[in-house]
Amino acid sequence: MKTFTAKKETVERDWYLVNADGKTLGRLATELARRLRGKHKPEYTPHVDTGDYLIVINAEKISVTGKKRKDKIYYRHTGYVGGIKQTTFEEMIARHPERVIEIAVKGMLPKGPLGRAMYRKLKVYKGATHHHIAQQPKVLNI
């Protein structure tokens, strides 16, 4: 009996809608990364993108435990000498709440072309509306 290997042409992908309201950031991000990779499917193959599309709404209502709301710091670099910038979790939620979830999930995906393809299937929105009604996403309770 041969080991089954998924082919990228035959992988069936579904669209799921996830509500981030009241969810803990890390616990939500791990489940999103797992589903983007396709590890929840029996036909999971490490070198093939077998994951589903995920739409996350209410990104601004995500929660963190402890004092991370004030203490957690996100760093980025402009590319210029001495151009390191830092933003706290509170500031990030106020300005770009979708980036908080995107950064957390991106760090949990593989680095390289396959990881970037998986990351592109994640759609995060502030508020309860999204632009993917035509895909008829199924509600996913995490």
From Swiss-Prot:
Q: Does the keyword Ribosomal protein apply?
A: yes
Q: How does it assemble?
A: Part of the 50S ribosomal subunit.
UniProt keyword terms in alphabetical order: Ribonucleoprotein, Ribosomal protein
Instruction: State one molecular function term (GO).
Output: structural constituent of ribosome
> Would you identify the family this protein belongs to, as annotated?
Belongs to the universal ribosomal protein uL13 family.
Ribonucleoprotein: is it a keyword of this entry?
yes
Function, in words: This protein is one of the early assembly proteins of the 50S ribosomal subunit, although it is not seen to bind rRNA by itself. It is important during the early stages of 50S assembly.
One of the protein's GO biological processes: translation
InterPro entries assigned: Ribosomal_uL13 (IPR005822), Ribosomal_uL13_bac-type (IPR005823), Ribosomal_uL13_CS (IPR023563), Ribosomal_uL13_sf (IPR036899)
Protein name stated in the entry: Large ribosomal subunit protein uL13
Query: Could you name the domain of life of the organism this protein comes from?
Result: Bacteria
Per the record, its GO cellular-component terms are: cytosolic large ribosomal subunit
* PROSITE patterns for the chain: RIBOSOMAL_L13
Pfam families listed in its UniProt record: Ribosomal_L13 (PF00572)
